[in-house]
């Protein structure tokens, strides 16, 4: 059964990297990857009735406009059950604390350990259903 993952990042290279690192899972039908370049675009994507349903959001923190922490707060207000993993090159304690307060499921620092990330995604209750 396929599930959708929404990746939010304003850097095209990062989007390409996620596409490459999840290529096998996409071919196997495990994950359908969706991408948004901003927090506003991510909220628009979440409002759509995407099938298969989005079961997790992976969001960069440092983005112009609505940053990843603001996006996290908005998502948690609208869909408190949706796991959001923040992804950032800045792993400082303040960002980590703020992400946790806002309800982040996981705080991931770059460079991303994709094997670990895939394992975390497999552990999501909605991904196994």
Q: Regions from the language model: what does each represent?
A:
Residues 117-129:
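Receiver (REC) domain switch/output surface
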Residues 113:
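Receiver (REC) domain switch/active-site region of two-component response regulators
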Residues 63:
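Receiver (REC) domain active-site loop signature in two-component systems and cognate sites
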Residues 12-34:
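Two-component/phosphorelay signaling modules centered on CheY-like receiver
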Residues 19, 35-56, 77:
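Acidic, metal-coordinating helix/loop segments flanking the phosphotransfer/catalytic sites
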């Amino acid at each position: 059964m396929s599930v959708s993952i929404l990746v939010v990042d304003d850097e095209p290279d990062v989007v390409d990297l996620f596409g490459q690192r999840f290529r096998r899972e996409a071919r196997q039908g495990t994950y359908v990857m969706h991408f948004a370049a901003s927090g506003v675009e991510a909220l628009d994507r979440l409002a759509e009735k995407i099938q298969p349903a989005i079961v997790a959001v992976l969001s960069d923190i440092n983005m112009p406009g609505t940053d990843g922490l603001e996006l996290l707060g908005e998502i948690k207000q609208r869909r408190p059950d949706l796991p959001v993993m923040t992804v950032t090159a800045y792993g400082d304690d303040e960002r980590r604390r703020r992400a946790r307060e806002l309800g982040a499921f996981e705080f991931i620092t770059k460079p991303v350990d994709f094997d670990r990330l895939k394992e975390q995604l497999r552990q999501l209750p909605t991904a196994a259903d």
